[in-house]
């Protein structure tokens, strides 16, 4: 899934820069997830990526309470608002973080929130006691390309070889 690919890519980039980071997700084995969780709980991992569904698990919440987490970072924060609860209800449950962890900071990021959605996110996550930082959406480092498929294996290999050392996500209508 794009979320898992993004988590894997971001963790890989952090590790290449000697940042102690990991991720928990359903594409990993239970043993891998357990090993990573235990390492995080023992203080060996400084940044842990996980889905709202994994974070808002009561057993994990109880453990995290003992760890003194200083910062929660929420990506795709627009899912907390308006249409999010019907799509992924655990995003809306993230609004409980301010009560569960009153001494922790919360940062939320989205690229797709209008003014009303931003205000709703701020209210749900911080009771509007926060700083809003807005930036433009122009990202010269990002690109989107659509290719007609002819010989998809050769096209994919050529595409990847032309971009060695770069990060990216390839979306396909077929399972590769």
Label every PLM stretch briefly.
Residues 1-15, 117:
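Conserved Walker A/P-loop ATP-binding site and its immediately adjacent core
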Residues 30-71, 81-85:
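Conserved helix/coil segment N-terminal to the catalytic DExD/H
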Residues 85-88, 116-124, 138-163:
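Inter-lobe coupling/hinge segments of SF2-like helicase ATPases
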Residues 174-176:
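Conserved small/polar residues in nucleotide/adenosyl-binding loops
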């Amino acid at each position: 899934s794009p979320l898992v690919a993004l988590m894997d890519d971001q963790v890989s980039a952090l590790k290449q820069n000697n940042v102690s980071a990991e991720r928990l997700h359903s594409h990993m084995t239970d043993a891998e997830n357990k090993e990573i969780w235990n390492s995080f709980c023992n203080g060996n991992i400084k940044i842990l990526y996980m889905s709202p569904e994994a974070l808002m698990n009561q057993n994990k919440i109880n453990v995290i309470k003992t760890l003194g987490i200083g910062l929660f970072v929420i990506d795709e924060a627009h899912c907390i608002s308006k249409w999010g609860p019907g799509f992924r209800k655990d995003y809306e449950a993230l609004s409980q973080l301010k009560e569960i962890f009153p001494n922790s900071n919360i940062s939320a990021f989205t690229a797709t929130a209008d003014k009303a959605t931003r205000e709703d996110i701020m209210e749900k996550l911080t009771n509007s006691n926060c700083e809003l930082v807005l930036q433009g959406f122009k990202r010269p480092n990002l690109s989107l390309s659509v290719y007609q498929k002819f010989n998809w294996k050769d096209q994919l290999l050529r595409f990847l070889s032309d971009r060695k050392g770069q990060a990216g996500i390839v979306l396909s209508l077929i399972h590769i």
